[in-house]
């Protein structure tokens, strides 16, 4: 104990000393002096012990000197070190926090024992503290067993949720079933209020009802004509509402599935739907927001379920393009908060009995796309794309917020690796936990952040997702649990309390990659949660057994799901074939995705078929005209009525008549009087990786399906009594209603009390404005209604996130664009209602094309006219508010009074009952009314301004892509003139200058053109703002309509014309001339003044001029031209002079670079004119050659506003009418557009017009095509083959399993054994590309993007890539590895997402699915490739070891006879070759039948070997280009003469030597075509060097190598080459020849020079430097590469020879699987030589390194990039090269082919020879 006490006292003394040192060095100097004095007095400092053991006290100064190695802050350093050291042993609870004051696991005194988890006994669990169970300690261990918890609850009647249900329980949730129930992506899923039913809403326009407990498909709700954007179930569980991109809301009764209402109050897509929790008697509200910037509140009665069709409507659109995209009700329903794209949050209040807007919160700086009210209070959280979220609460008469910045990082955690990759943080989703204590935000860096909702403090960062997260779903009663899902296919269950992952699920779809999860919901009881994905699946998760789900099929569709519907005037639907409401049809049959019926055991799962007999469960099958099996009707005993038989027979006859047509009409003609002729529901293209052009059987079943049996009255009564979704029990419903009522009253009370409280003093700019409820009842239509508008919010979003536009056009609301010109919405502009309605009418040029708009949605402006006509559009949803009805009636009266005004030019909306679904038919009706009133059809003819074919300066004719200056003053004058003359109805208040700030002149770009039939014909333009400096779009636009009117000056001026005039300087008195009516008129400038004083800088009509005839007028500078010296003046003053043809040509537009492609305009026009001439000779184009005969078709001009034809286009091309090729293509498309407008869809002439248009467009785009006939033939064959393929696909009979295989591309590339072929990846990638080309999703990515159609593509995408380019590169063999191919394919997907970042677009979804599909398949290819590399590496090492082991044990007697028989290998006859860029041509030499004599002895030619393959000398010499990439040349000395009597093989070698002889110095050293006789004679004089080197590459007699040399620099100091000697083991003799250095030796150099001087080298002297040289340098130094030759064998060094080899053969043979290196590295040394890369120089110091195993990473790189290595048998003792693949016999043959083997020469010049005894001893190598 005394020792311990002594040790403690010593530590205490040292601590006092360190404290004093620390204080003395810090700011507490006085405290330090006091401490030093006190410790000295009490002798508390460390003591000194002398040699006798006595202790002596020390002073402080003495200790400082003694411990001078200690820094003053030594104590602080100790404290710094303690924490990390302890952390390694016992980790603390919060990593990264360093403190000396912590407790528990943060304490520096913690031990393993103190950190152990506490476990309570049963008595502690049963205890109560303040009437409730006590809190568990922080270090509480695993939760107690459920038995202990239940027993404690039984004793005390209380429990804590974390004890009763620990989060570990959620690990037992598993996926019960994944069901394919839709053909497209499913963005919406929700549970009913009981949790027993699941609803899914998909892009295939269907809403389906599923049973939660067993996964059965119970019902399908049909009626929508576009994608489902949002769904909501009311709190009473009696009805479901679904919003769609067709601008309608459909409401169904959940009990019977009967439709209750079709609500039409929006003019654009529905973005969110919410049933209000508000309870005010039986009065309830349904709210809806739309992309048109409006919010509607629909009043309905809870008792009768009747909905008022006239909503209370608020238009929140301060500028065009603003969309309301999300909404959320408070718990009591008294508040509704909405988010929109104008960054404003709007709050509505219901406390007064009617909805009223109370606040507009403009604190976010980007769009607010996620919003959510808390579960129990009046707080809500908003998430924005500006990277922040805000928690709002109403206090002191204003909404106050807590800022949550997504850039915040938690203390102690380093997230830089993730967050640094994201340039701008964006909130993608927000949510509350169940108790509202925390707010969860999803960020675009794939993380979730958990915040304290009261303080805004960041609590946790949850990481686990690999892509953006758009689904956050809190548990319904457990505040610790959150579900999240995203586009990465992961569904993760989180523990919010601990910030850890509980369980994750990955939605992997076999053969298709992963499916992005688009929505997720949890059932009210928390027992299940359901997810939907991008491939149409419903995923059901839950606790317990999955046995019930095993009884259902994996694919569940009803055979009637996609049958066509007919609509009445109110948009209610009937099944077209049965003429019955869908909910009254007989129970359908269950089929798979191909339309094949499921077995009878599955049919019993259909409601209504549970008790059917077996024969009634077997559907009657038929075959459609396309060969598809389909369900005809159920097999019933009742007889078919005669009327049914007749109808069925007539329908079959009609189907037979239609079957000859390629396109089936989309319109359905009905015989029922109450049903108007409407369009069939057009389903979006199927999603999923199906073959291109293939249609799912279940979707195709409606094409010719006979009518099912008509239900009897008894059936109708029975079906009307069925209950699909049960209502809530009375007790539960009343209890929930009471709770909601109480919450509502509480919210009103809180709001009223806060309203009375005084403001706190806040800065003026922070005050939140409040706006009255009458704020914005004037509403504006959106600039377009996109079919792909998929942004919708529940309290959170169910569809993908809104688009992101990082380009300058950030404000462009592309989702609302439906025109093919790529509309751009003004940032601060507007457009009138009638203009927008006209812009989107069927007669316009802006017909919808979903594919087209997907590509251009976020890319800016597209200059192309429409490609396709839409499927017949449903009627436009109109407002039905009282105020709008009043204004509508007045406007209708006004229109009736003005008989000359066109019907579609009404200022107000049209009554739903009077407006026809087709705008085209409405126009025909209007024409009929007008002709009855005395108007003639001639008045409907378009003016010459439209039909003119000659380009004119005035009037201005707009063309697509024109850059123009817009002059507001001129437009105002036009509007005033049109109103004054009552030409047509025009509302000046809705002109663009009332909607936005317009300067006197604006630079614009024409991005949309359409012509409108009427009196007069109007031109509707869409103009986008241009930046005059950059020439790029700034993001704003507006629309306008006008026509050429006499006495109205053009207010649109071409930019080129304006720029030319701007730089002219006109002075008063200057003479000018101007073009008016194709003639020159002359005048004089009198003065200059602005037209209007408010626009002093405007050039519009700023000059006062006097014409020569005396008239005065105001003129603009661009209308005036300088008078040239050679001008022709009129004979009489005041008259005009006609323009000449030359003058006309000089005044027309001069095209800019690229506007006509790569060719000049004249050349392109002549080429296209020639093509049109050829096209006009074809029969298919006969209908479009000349203008339509108006005598035969008098109504044509009343339907078609802009007539055109091939002859008109040709004439305009000849006159250079078109200013750019996009303008021409726009008009070409109008041929098809006009044909489609006037004729019935699907008619032969419409198909012909489409073919002619596509043919001509292809011809125009291909600027290398000068003959259109071959293109016509190929397109015709393609059309025929496509139709045949479709029929062939449909004709495949068989079971559902077989048909599934036939219709689906193979999902697995291979099911074979592991391949170890390094080149196998090429075949696998080729199969994968073929598979991708079969997928429909790959269609946009198969060919390069057409830059004419998407001119801004290269502005956004730096490196375009497509699958055709990838395939060509692969076939050409330009990919070195599958990693390179993988990089290019991933570039395709990244380009797609960059150009079309809108996550709701079809292109984006296709990219997601195809990317997942590719990644799944390429992973196996990459794995096989790496496995093959590893296998080859291991195999190489094994062979080396085996050869060493065998060589060490070979008997010497095996080679006792050096004269043994030599083997002559059979020549290889492989003839494939590939020529590199550096190849040198060779000349073929006929073979000579002579035998080679080597060293005086006739021998067979020895076989030259490569590193891994046998080398065969081909006796047949053919002309082959040499591949210099493989050729490395060496300077060697050889025999140059041919000796008669030698063998063919030796002759071949002889010829190769002769061909490789260099010419004279004046000639190229690489010219193999001629022989150099002088060089030959020279070399014959020299004594042959009796040494042999093996070739490092495979030689052939026909492929001759270049020469390269390795020179060893000796003692010479000059840069010239010096003579040397053959260096063998340090000895020299003959003039040096180039010798490749072998392992274990330094390089030996042989150099031929003209000098006879011989410089000897000392034994063992090492070379100083190595040099790489160019062939030219060799030639300049008179060093000639010598011919390739097989030299005699030597026991020491073998000269390595190289020959040019075919590249493909080299790739096949080389061990590394890689082409030879093509780069030659150069260094500056004394001599310029070439070092062969195929032979590696080894030294003694590194000879053992090769024998050591190489790790896999090094091996991978070596095999990919390095050349073969040469090795030696003797490991440095001798330098005889060998290859490790050589067999023992081959090595002996190579080594001992001659008895007179030499070692070169000694230092004295004597030849060193190997004796017989030594030669026999060498056999054991």
UniProtKB/Swiss-Prot annotation:
A GO term, aspect molecular function: insulin receptor binding
Ranges of compositional bias, category Basic residues: 912-924, 1297-1310, 1435-1446
Record cross-link Glycyl lysine isopeptide (Lys-Gly) (interchain with G-Cter in SUMO1), residues: 1470
Disulfide bonds: none
Residues found modified as N6-acetyllysine: 1497, 1533
Modified residues (Phosphothreonine): 1359
Modified residue annotations for Phosphoserine: 136, 641, 659, 674, 677, 683, 692, 879-881, 911, 1281, 1283, 1296, 1315, 1405, 1479, 1525, 1560, 1651, 1762, 1783
Pfam families: Bromodomain, BRWD1_N, BRWD_AD, WD40
Compositionally biased intervals (Low complexity): 665-679, 841-854, 1447-1457
Effect of residue 1767 to I: In a colorectal cancer sample; somatic mutation
WD repeat copies, ranges: 181-222, 224-262, 265-310, 319-360, 363-402, 422-461, 464-504, 512-551
Entry comment describing in which tissues the protein is expressed: Expressed in myeloma and epidermoid carcinoma cell lines.
Recorded superkingdom: Eukaryota
Biased amino acid composition, Basic and acidic residues: 751-767, 775-788, 800-810
Domain Bromo: 1156-1263, 1316-1421
Ranges for region Disordered: 658-689, 751-927, 1280-1310, 1435-1507, 1555-1597, 1623-1646, 1751-1784
GO cellular component terms attached to this protein's record: nucleus
Residues covered by region (Mediates interaction with IRS1): 924-1129
InterPro entries named in the record: Bromo_WD_repeat, Bromodomain, Bromodomain-like_sf, Bromodomain_CS, WD40/YVTN_repeat-like_dom_sf, WD40_repeat_CS, WD40_repeat_dom_sf, WD40_rpt
CDD domains the record matches: Bromo_WDR9_I_like, Bromo_WDR9_II, WD40
Complexes and interactors: Interacts with IRS1 and IRS2. Interacts (via bromo domain) with acetylated lysine residues on histone H1.4, histone H3 and H4 (in vitro).
Illness: Chung-Jansen syndrome: An autosomal dominant disorder characterized by developmental delay, intellectual disability, autistic features, anxiety, hypotonia, obesity, and dysmorphic features.
This protein's name: PH-interacting protein
Organism, as annotated: Homo sapiens
Gene: PHIP
């Amino acid at each position: 104990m005394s020792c311990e006490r002594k040790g403690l006292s010593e530590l205490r003394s040292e601590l006092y000393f360190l404290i004093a040192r620390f204080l003395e060095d810090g700011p507490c100097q006085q405290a330090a002096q006091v401490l030093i004095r006190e410790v000295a007095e009490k002798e508390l400092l460390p003591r000194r012990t002398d040699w006798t053991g006595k202790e002596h006290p020390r002073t402080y100064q003495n200790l400082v000197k003694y411990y001078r190695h200690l820094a003053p802050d030594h104590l602080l350093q100790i404290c710094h070190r303690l924490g990390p050291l302890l952390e390694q042993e016992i980790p603390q609870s919060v990593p990264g926090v360093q403190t000396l004051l912590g407790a528990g696991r943060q304490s520096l005194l913690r031990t393993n024992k103190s950190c152990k988890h506490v476990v309570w006994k049963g008595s502690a669990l049963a205890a109560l503290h303040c009437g409730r169970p006590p809190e568990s300690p922080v270090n509480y261990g695993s939760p107690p067993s459920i038995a202990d918890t239940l027993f404690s609850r039984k004793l005390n009647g209380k429990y804590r949720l974390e004890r009763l249900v620990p989060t570990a329980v959620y690990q037992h949730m598993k996926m019960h079933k994944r069901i394919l129930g839709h053909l497209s992506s499913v963005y919406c899923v929700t549970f009913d209020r009981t949790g027993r039913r699941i609803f899914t809403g998909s892009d295939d326009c269907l809403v389906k009802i599923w049973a939660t407990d067993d996964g059965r498909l119970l019902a399908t709700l049909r009626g929508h004509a576009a994608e489902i954007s949002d769904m909501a179930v009311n709190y009473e569980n009696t009805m479901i509402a679904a919003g769609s991109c067709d601008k309608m809301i459909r409401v169904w009764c959940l009990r019977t599935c009967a439709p209750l209402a079709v609500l039409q109050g929006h003019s654009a897509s529905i973005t969110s739907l919410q049933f209000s929790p508000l309870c005010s008697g039986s009065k309830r509200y349904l709210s809806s927001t739309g992309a048109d910037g409006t919010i509607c509140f629909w009043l309905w009665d809870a008792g009768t379920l009747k909905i008022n069709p006239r909503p209370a409507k608020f238009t929140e659109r301060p500028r065009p393009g603003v969309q309301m995209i999300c909404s959320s009700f408070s718990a009591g329903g008294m508040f509704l908060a909405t988010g929109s794209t104008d960054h404003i949050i709007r709050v509505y209040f219901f406390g007064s009995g009617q909805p009223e807007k109370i606040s507009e919160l403009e604190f976010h700086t980007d769009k607010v796309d996620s919003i959510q009210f808390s579960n129990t209070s009046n707080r809500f959280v908003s998430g924005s794309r500006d990277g922040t979220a805000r928690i709002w609460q109403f206090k002191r008469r204003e909404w106050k917020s807590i800022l949550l910045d997504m850039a915040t990082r938690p203390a102690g955690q380093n997230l830089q690796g993730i967050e640094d990759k994201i340039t701008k943080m964006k909130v993608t989703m927000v949510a509350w936990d169940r108790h509202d204590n925390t707010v969860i935000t999803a960020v675009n860096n794939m993380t979730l952040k958990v915040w304290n909702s009261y303080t805004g403090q960041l609590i946790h960062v949850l990481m686990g997702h690999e892509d953006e997260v758009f689904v956050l779903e809190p548990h319904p009663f457990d505040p610790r649990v959150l579900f999240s899902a995203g586009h990465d296919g992961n569904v993760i269950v989180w523990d919010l309390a601990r910030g850890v992952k509980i369980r994750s699920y990955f939605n992997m779809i076999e053969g298709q990659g992963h499916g992005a999860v688009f929505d997720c919901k949890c059932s009210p009881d928390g027992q299940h949660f359901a997810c939907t994905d991008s491939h149409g699946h419903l995923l059901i998760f839950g606790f317990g057994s999955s046995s019930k789900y095993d009884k259902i099929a994996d694919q569940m569709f009803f055979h009637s799901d996609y049958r066509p519907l007919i609509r009445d005037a109110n948009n209610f639907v009937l099944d077209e074939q049965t003429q019955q409401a869908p909910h009254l049809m007989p129970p359908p049959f269950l089929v798979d995705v191909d339309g094949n019926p499921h077995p009878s055991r599955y049919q019993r799962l259909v409601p209504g078929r549970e008790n059917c007999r077996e024969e009634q469960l077997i559907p009657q099958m038929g075959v459609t005209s396309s060969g598809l099996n389909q369900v005809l009707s159920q097999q019933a005993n009742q007889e078919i009525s005669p009327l049914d038989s007749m109808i069925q027979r007539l329908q079959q006859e009609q189907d037979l008549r239609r079957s000859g047509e390629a396109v089936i009409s989309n319109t359905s003609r009905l015989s029922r009087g109450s049903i108007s002729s409407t369009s069939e529901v057009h389903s979006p293209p199927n999603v999923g990786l199906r073959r291109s052009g293939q249609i799912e059987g279940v979707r195709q079943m409606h094409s010719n399906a006979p009518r099912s049996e008509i239900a009897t009255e008894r059936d109708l009564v029975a079906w009307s009594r069925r209950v699909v979704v049960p209502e809530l029990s009375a007790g539960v419903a009343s209890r929930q209603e009471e709770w909601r009522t109480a919450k509502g009253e509480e919210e009103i009370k809180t709001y009223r009390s806060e309203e009375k409280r005084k403001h706190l003093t806040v800065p003026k700019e922070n005050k939140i404005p409040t706006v009255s409820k009458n704020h914005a009842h004037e509403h504006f239509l959106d600039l377009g209604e996109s079919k792909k508008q998929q942004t919708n919010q529940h309290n959170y979003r169910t569809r993908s996130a809104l688009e992101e536009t990082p380009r300058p056009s950030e404000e462009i609301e592309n989702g609302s664009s439906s025109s093919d010109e790529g509309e751009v919405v003004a940032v601060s502009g507007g457009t009138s209602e009638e203009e927008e309605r006209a812009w989107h009418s069927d007669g316009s040029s802006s017909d919808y094309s979903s594919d087209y708009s997907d590509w251009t949605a976020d890319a800016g402006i597209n200059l192309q006219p429409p490609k396709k006509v839409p499927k017949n559009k449903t009627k436009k949803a109109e407002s039905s508010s009282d105020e709008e009805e009043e204004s509508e009636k007045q406007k209708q009266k006004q229109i009736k009074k003005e008989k000359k005004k066109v019907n579609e030019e009404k200022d107000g909306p049209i009554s739903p009952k009077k407006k026809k679904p087709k705008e085209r038919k409405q126009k025909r009706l209007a024409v009929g009314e007008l002709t009855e009133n005395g108007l003639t059809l001639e008045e409907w003819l378009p003016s010459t301004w439209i039909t003119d074919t000659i380009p004119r300066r005035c009037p201005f004719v707009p063309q697509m892509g024109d850059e123009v200056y817009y002059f507001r003053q001129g437009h105002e004058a036009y509007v005033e003139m049109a109103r004054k003359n009552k030409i047509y109805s025009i509302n000046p208040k809705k002109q663009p200058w009332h909607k936005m700030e317009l300067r006197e002149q604006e630079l614009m770009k024409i991005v949309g053109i359409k012509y409108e039939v009427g009196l007069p014909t109007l031109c509707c333009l869409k103009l986008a703002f241009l930046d005059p400096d950059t020439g790029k779009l700034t993001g704003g636009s507006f629309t306008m309509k006008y026509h050429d009117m006499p006495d109205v000056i053009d207010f649109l001026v071409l930019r080129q014309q304006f720029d030319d005039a701007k730089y002219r300087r006109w002075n008063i008195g200057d003479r000018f001339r101007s073009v008016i009516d194709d003639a020159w008129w002359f005048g004089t400038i009198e003065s200059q003044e602005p037209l209007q004083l408010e626009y002093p800088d405007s050039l519009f009509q700023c000059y006062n001029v006097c014409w020569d005839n005396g008239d005065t007028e105001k003129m603009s500078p661009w209308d005036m031209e300088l008078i040239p010296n050679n001008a022709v003046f009129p004979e009489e003053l005041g008259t005009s002079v006609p323009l000449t043809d030359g003058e006309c040509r000089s005044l027309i537009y001069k095209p800019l670079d690229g506007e006509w492609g790569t060719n000049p305009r004249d050349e392109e026009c002549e080429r296209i004119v020639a093509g049109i001439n050829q096209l006009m000779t074809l029969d298919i184009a006969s209908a479009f050659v000349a203008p339509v005969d108006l005598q035969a078709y008098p109504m044509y001009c009343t339907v078609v506003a802009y007539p055109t034809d091939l002859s008109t286009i040709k004439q305009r091309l000849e006159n250079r009418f078109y200013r750019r090729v996009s303008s021409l293509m726009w008009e070409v498309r109008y041929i098809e557009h006009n044909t489609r407008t006037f004729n019935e869809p699907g008619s032969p002439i419409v198909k012909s017009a489409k073919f002619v248009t596509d043919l001509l467009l292809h011809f125009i785009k291909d600027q290398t095509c000068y003959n259109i006939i071959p293109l016509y033939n190929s397109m015709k064959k393609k059309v025929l083959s496509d139709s045949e393929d479709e029929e062939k696909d449909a004709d495949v009979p068989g079971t559902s399993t077989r048909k599934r295989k036939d219709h689906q591309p193979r999902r697995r590339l291979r099911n074979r054994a592991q391949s170890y072929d390094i080149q196998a990846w090429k075949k696998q990638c080729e199969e994968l590309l073929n598979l991708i080309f079969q997928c429909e999703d790959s269609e946009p990515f198969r060919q390069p993007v057409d830059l004419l159609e998407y001119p801004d593509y290269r502005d956004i995408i730096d490196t375009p890539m497509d699958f055709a380019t990838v395939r060509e590169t692969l076939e050409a063999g330009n990919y070195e590895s599958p990693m390179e191919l993988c990089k290019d394919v991933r570039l395709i997907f990244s380009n797609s997402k960059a150009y079309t970042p809108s996550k709701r677009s079809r292109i984006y979804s296709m990219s997601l699915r195809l990317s997942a599909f590719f990644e799944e398949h390429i992973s196996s290819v990459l794995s096989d490739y790496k496995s093959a590399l590893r296998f080859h590496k291991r195999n190489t090492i094994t062979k080396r070891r085996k050869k060493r082991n065998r060589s060490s044990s070979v008997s010497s007697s095996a080679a006792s006879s050096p004269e043994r028989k030599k083997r002559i290998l059979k020549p290889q006859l492989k003839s494939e070759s590939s020529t590199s860029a550096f190849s040198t041509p060779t000349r073929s030499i006929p073979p000579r039948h002579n035998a080679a004599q080597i060293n005086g002895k006739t021998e067979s030619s020895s076989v030259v070997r490569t590193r891994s393959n046998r080398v065969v000398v081909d006796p047949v010499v053919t002309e082959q280009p040499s591949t210099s990439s493989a050729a490395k040349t060496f300077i060697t000395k050889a025999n140059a003469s041919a000796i008669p009597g030698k063998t063919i093989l030796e002759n071949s070698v002889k010829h190769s030597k002769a061909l490789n002889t260099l010419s004279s110095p004046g000639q190229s050293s690489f010219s193999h075509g001629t022989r150099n006789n002088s060089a030959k004679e020279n070399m014959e004089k020299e004594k042959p060097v009796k040494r042999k080197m093996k070739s490092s590459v495979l030689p052939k007699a026909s492929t001759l190598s270049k020469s390269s040399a390795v020179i060893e620099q000796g003692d010479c100091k000059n840069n010239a080459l010096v003579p040397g000697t053959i260096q063998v083991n340090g000895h020299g003799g003959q003039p040096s020849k180039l010798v490749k250095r072998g392992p274990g030796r330094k390089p030996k150099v042989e150099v031929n020079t003209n000098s006879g001087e011989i410089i000897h080298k000392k034994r063992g002297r090492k070379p100083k430097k190595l040099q790489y040289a160019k062939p030219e340098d060799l030639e300049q130094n008179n060093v000639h590469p010598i011919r390739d030759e097989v030299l005699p064998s030597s026991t020491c060094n073998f000269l390595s020879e190289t020959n040019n080899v075919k590249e493909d053969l080299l790739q096949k043979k080389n061990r590394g699987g890689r082409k030879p290196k093509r780069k030659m590295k150069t260094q500056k040394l004394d001599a310029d030589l070439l070092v062969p890369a195929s032979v590696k120089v080894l030294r003694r110091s590194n000879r053992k390194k090769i024998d050591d195993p190489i790790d896999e990473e090094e091996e991978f790189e070596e095999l990919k990039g390095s050349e073969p290595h040469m090795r030696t048998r003797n490991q440095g003792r001798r330098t005889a090269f060998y290859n490790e693949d050589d067999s023992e016999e081959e090595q002996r043959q190579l080594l001992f082919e001659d008895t007179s083997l030499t070692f070169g020469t000694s230092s004295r010049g004597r030849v060193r020879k190997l004796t017989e005894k030594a030669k026999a001893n060498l056999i054991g190598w």
